[in-house]
Curated annotation (Swiss-Prot):
Its main location: cytoplasm. NADP(+) binds at G268, V269, G270, Q271, T272, P273. Heme b binds at H85. FAD binds at Y188, R204, Q205, Y206, S207, C388, F389, G390, P391. The active site is at Y95 (charge relay system), E135 (charge relay system). Is involved in NO detoxification in an aerobic process, termed nitric oxide dioxygenase (NOD) reaction that utilizes O(2) and NAD(P)H to convert NO to nitrate, which protects the bacterium from various noxious nitrogen compounds. Therefore, plays a central role in the inducible response to nitrosative stress. Gene3D superfamilies: Globins, Nucleotide-binding domain of ferredoxin-NADP reductase (FNR) module, Translation factors. GO terms for cellular component: cytoplasm. It holds the Pfam family NAD_binding_1. Coiled coil: none annotated. The lineage of its organism: Bacteria, Pseudomonadati, Pseudomonadota, Gammaproteobacteria, Enterobacterales. This is Flavohemoprotein. Residues 150-255 form the FAD-binding FR-type domain.
Length: 395
């Protein structure tokens, strides 16, 4: 535990941190990658270039300083970050590297005095130990279950199938032929890529799109305009190739009783974790209403439409609707399609307010747009769960 003097010192630095903004974390990352370039094998350098990771770390530092007297308020964020760290196979000694560069950044930018540096050193040590312990537990749980493992494991691409003009799915089986770890519907796999085309190892997380079966995993990858790894998987990776995976991780997953109505709300490639949830609801013989609500630019980029239709044909309580921003005349005539932006108030059957749990995934602006509608309809914040692809943002 931190003493009151340390807490007071940390809180006194909040105005300075707020005034500096993400320039603080930009300096930190520049310093760390200069002195420890091996960490570029872990970090997504695309998120470094666009500033998303700098912003996410800055927000995390400010949140820690703000809630330094109420650390339980940070537990959801700790769990989300620990799950992501576990997918990167983060080790305890790497926290020491981060701590060294964090304190050096504070000294170089602010010259705040030894008392402030000592306080932040203590505070960082407490937080690092929380993460180290939680991640150790996650590693043990992953390795200890049937089919589980720690670190990375080679998998073969046994099927590669275009699902739309932008999204391709990959079915992956373990090279060793053994069983594979179960996962919670909504979780993701970390894919490790080493190739001469890349200066450093590249690690990306992709949501699982099938239900747990003990034999294979399926992911789906959207081709991003500037995406080096998505381009590699779309254009270079072939059936029969071997890639390495970490075990499934993630804090976004389906957690409802059979009597709980569920709304799966997505846009674009954000439907990938929802697919796993939907297949699991079907195979668990879910009893309550299920709403599949998806937004796509047009029919050309709309992935998995046939798969959803097949599920709907065998699941009477499923209501499936799609919104096309650039709808064709054929799509607009469909009884289950709308033209324009998603408007939840236009559903033929209103969403049930009582006990409905809503799962959201897609671009941040879309999730903010959908969440506002849900709140206006009477859904509470506790009924809304969401996943950000990339660094976390609050919707």
């Amino acid at each position: 535990m931190l003493d009151q003097q340390t807490i007071a010192t940390i809180k006194s630095t909040i105005p300075l941190l707020a005034e500096t903004g993400p320039a603080l974390t930009a300096h930190f990352y520049q310093r760390m990658f200069h002195h420890n370039p091996e960490l570029k094998d872990i970090f997504n350098m695309s998120n470094q270039r666009n500033g998303d990771q700098r912003e996410a770390l800055f927000n995390a530092i400010c949140a820690y300083a703000t809630h330094i007297e109420n650390l339980p308020a940070l537990l959801p964020a700790v769990e989300r970050i620990a799950q992501k760290h576990a997918s990167f196979n983060i080790q305890p000694e790497q926290y020491q590297i981060v701590g060294t560069h964090l304190l050096a950044t504070l000294e170089e930018m602010f010259q705040p005095g030894q008392a402030v540096l000592d306080a932040w050193g203590k505070a960082y040590g407490v937080l690092a130990n929380v993460f180290i312990q939680r991640e150790s537990d996650i590693y043990q749980q992953s390795a200890g279950q049937n089919g589980g493992w720690h670190g990375i494991r080679p998998f073969r691409i046994v099927a590669k199938q275009p699902q739309s003009s932008l999204i391709t799915s990959f079915t992956l089986e373990p090279v060793d032929g053994g069983p594979i770890a179960a996962f919670r519907p909504g979780q993701y796999l970390a894919v490790y890529i080493r190739d001469k085309r890349f200066e450093y190892q590249e690690i990306r997380q992709y949501s699982l799109t099938n239900e747990p079966n003990g034999r294979y995993y399926r992911i789906a990858v959207k081709r991003e305009t500037m995406g080096s790894v998505s381009g590699y998987l779309h254009d270079v990776a072939r059936e029969g190739d071997v890639i390495e995976l970490a075990a499934p991780h993630g804090d976004f997953y389906l957690e409802v009783t059979p009597e709980t109505p569920v709304a799966l709300i997505s846009a674009g490639v954000g439907q990938t974790p929802m697919l796993s949830m939907l297949h699991s609801l079907k195979n668990q013989q879910h009893q309550a209403d299920i709403f599949w609500l998806h937004a796509a630019e047009n029919t050309e980029v709309h992935a998995f439409a046939d798969e959803i239709a097949d599920v709907a044909a065998t699941l009477p309580q499923l209501q499936s609707y799609v919104w096309y921003r650039e709808a064709s005349s054929e799509a607009a005539r469909s009884a289950h399609a709308f033209h324009g932006l998603m408007a939840l108030k236009d559903l033929p059957t209103p969403l049930p307010m009582t006990n409905l749990h809503c799962y959201l995934c897609g671009p941040v602006a879309f999730m903010q747009f959908a969440a506002r509608q849900l709140l206006e309809l009477g859904i509470t914040e506790s009924q809304i769960h969401y996943e950000c692809f990339g660094p976390h943002k609050v919707i």
